Design a protein with these regions (language model features):
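N-terminal glycine-rich phosphate-binding loop for ADP-containing cofactors
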Residues: 1-124
Length: 124
């Protein structure tokens, strides 16, 4: 290790948490709901995958789903990243993405192509 980060590595002793960590960064004002944590992890990957389709990096839903499971470790129970969006329901996914964006930042804003697809209720 480089000797930098969250832990102190004293010579010949056990590592321990850097004492200034809590004072420098503190705790969040309010706890983040577990559902938000789970969905933030899934939604940010799903939104980026839609952008990859928009930009031609991915060309088929099948490639996106298989690649997301085997390539980036997206949970297999979802059927893949685009199947996750389909299962969530496109209009509901867009609505929830907007809620996450309002609470946690613009990286959760749904791309225009996803909004248009949701308006027509056309699955991937």
């Amino acid at each position: 290790a480089a000797g930098k980060g969250f832990y102190e590595y004293p010579e010949g002793a056990r590592k321990f948490l850097w004492p200034e960590l809590a004072t420098r960064y503190g705790r969040a004002q309010a706890p983040v709901p577990l559902a938000d944590i789970k969905e933030r992890l899934l939604f940010v990957q799903a939104i980026e995958t839609v952008r990859c389709l928009d930009e031609g990096v991915l060309t088929t839903s099948r490639d996106a789903n298989i690649g997301s499971i085997f390539g980036i470790g997206f949970p297999a129970w979802t059927g893949g990243v685009l199947q996750y969006i389909n299962g969530y329901g496109l209009p509901a996914f867009v609505a929830r993405a907007r809620e996450l964006a309002q609470a946690y930042g613009d990286r959760f804003l749904p791309p225009a192509s996803l909004i248009e697809r949701a308006a027509r209720n056309v699955d991937f």
